[in-house]
Amino acid sequence: MSDSSREENVYMAKLADEAERYEEMVEFMEKVAKTVEVEELTVEERNLLSVAYKNVIGARRASWRIISSIEQKEESRGNEDHVAIIKEYRGKIEAELSKICDGILNLLESNLIPSAASPESKVFYLKMKGDYHRYLAEFKTGAERKEAAESTLLAYKSAQDIALADLAPTHPIRLGLALNFSVFYYEILNSPDRACNLAKQAFDEAISELDTLGEESYKDSTLIMQLLRDNLTLWTSDITDIAGDEIKETSKQQPGE
């Protein structure tokens, strides 16, 4: 792909973002991502790729949660005919989720992670790899769930090793990793203690170096720190009474997601 067509695809991705046409945004950024053997993605390009996939997967994750909630209610009422219909519909959403996750995971494995030169980009892509394996673990069952959870843990740990060695405690990508890694411990591994320890350590280390934070990343970093604190408050409160509360993870606006 020539420089001009790479630039054109980036511009088209921005247009698709403005128009909220995220499937097309993914297509444009996939084309850009496949040019990394020439030059790795810029910060802007990798954030566009992340935003595109986050929106495409986010819509399906929300749909899956709603349908699963309705399924539970119908099961409790004994409406077996409705449950059968819902299960089939849930399966359709899960197939879409799997396809999206497989798409970005293949791109990360084949193109983006091998081309990453800086510690920042390595952590960004390994975190992304962990995120999309985690999204698979949210709805898979049995051996597939176990495999997705193990892959998530490996990716997050690899990212964490680099982040702790090479990124400042206040770096938004390091903080975003800690946020999502702690959510993984809480939601997927059912380990509230580990989730709280990880989130608290990340928050405390960032607080102690807050005065060194540059103006350009201050807003991003403090926003993620607030999300870490929100989750800690949620998890350390009466954890038997958190149904309906929303656990925070890095959103499309965060530079780590």
From Swiss-Prot:
It comes from the Eukaryota. SMART domains: 14_3_3 (SM00101). The lineage of its organism: Eukaryota, Viridiplantae, Streptophyta, Embryophyta, Tracheophyta. Belongs to the 14-3-3 family. This is 14-3-3-like protein A. Pfam families: 14-3-3. GO terms for biological process: protein localization; signal transduction. One of its GO terms (cellular component) is cytoplasm.
